[in-house]
Structures are given as structure tokens and as C-alpha cells.
Amino acid sequence: MTNPTLLCDGCGQAAAAEHVTQRLQRLEWMTRYRPVHVGTVLLGAYSPDAESDFLYAETEETAGEAARVLAAVGISPDRKTKEVVLSEFQRGGFLLGYVLECPLEPESRSEVAVAALLKARMPAFLARLRRSFQPKRLASISSKLDPFLAGLTEKELGCALVSDGGKSFALDGPSAEKEIEKLREAHAAARAAGR
């Protein structure tokens, strides 16, 4: 049972001890493979539930979102250890981050609740993006972020926004394969242009 007075500082949800422990574990895994110089932050709305879907988890299986992200950046996990895959991702200058650093709790799964959490956390995430990550580029991989990124300038972000005509590359949507290809092409063009 969660204590409604304790809110997680990584997502803003009511948090039990297990929630905080899971957040800290995932933060530790991500930090281990954070590039010294971040080229591109791939930004999701919230962390996936399953550890196999969380790219940085110490699992052998890479599924769901993690597999789609690797496909989008051209890294194949076939016949490689997770450590090798994550090292390639790191050397490529990629960092996968989330506005809400934790999976959604059952009471936070409605569209309205997700939108409210994202709206509340966006200022803190943008500060972290500018002050800590300091990437050259940001590419959103969740359509849930479109209302919050629309209209933001390069100055507000602290980096270039790589987008699909002003929209996110919806790797969390029904046309993920098409979005993977769009992201791959847009990212290559942004790198070639020096953005």
C-alpha cells in the first residue's frame, strides 16, 4: 500500500518503498551507461513496466521498447551480451531517458492522470536536460509528449529537437516499425547537418 503523503521525486506519483527502490535501481543501471558527452537523448514519457522493456536493465532479454529503441539507432542485440549492446549504445552517444522516471502505478494509468503527471514533471525534466544531460539533440519517442514539446525552442531545450514534422517518433504507437525508420532517417540527417 502506498503512503499518499510520500511522492516520488522521479515521477510525482504516490510511492511505497518498493517504488523508490525500483527507481533507484533503474537510475543506477542508466547511469552506468550514460555517455560522457551525450549526443542524443531519446525521450520517452514514462519508464516501462517490464524490466525486459527497460533498455538498461540487467536482463538477458531485450523486448518491447528496448528492442524498438535499439532498432531505431541501428544496434542489433543478436549474439551479443547486454553489456556489449549497452556499450555500443553509449559509444553512439545515445541516452534513453524519461520525463517520468518510473513505471506508472495502477491509479496513474488513465490518459488524464498521465497528462497531469507529465505536465507537472516537464519543468524539472527540462532543467535536468539543460543542466545535467546537455545533449546536442533530443528526439521524443512517445506521442504522449507532443503537447508538452510543441512550441519549445532550441533555447528552452538547450539542444536541437529532432522531430517528425513537429511530432514525436511514436515508438509506443501502432505503427512502430514505420516510426523506427523515420527516426533513423531524421537522426542521420541531423547528425550530418551537425545539429
Predicted regions and their residues:
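A polyanion-binding, active-site-adjacent surface
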Residues: 2-155, 159-162
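Short, flexible loop segments at boundaries between secondary-structure elements
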Residues: 70-78, 157-191
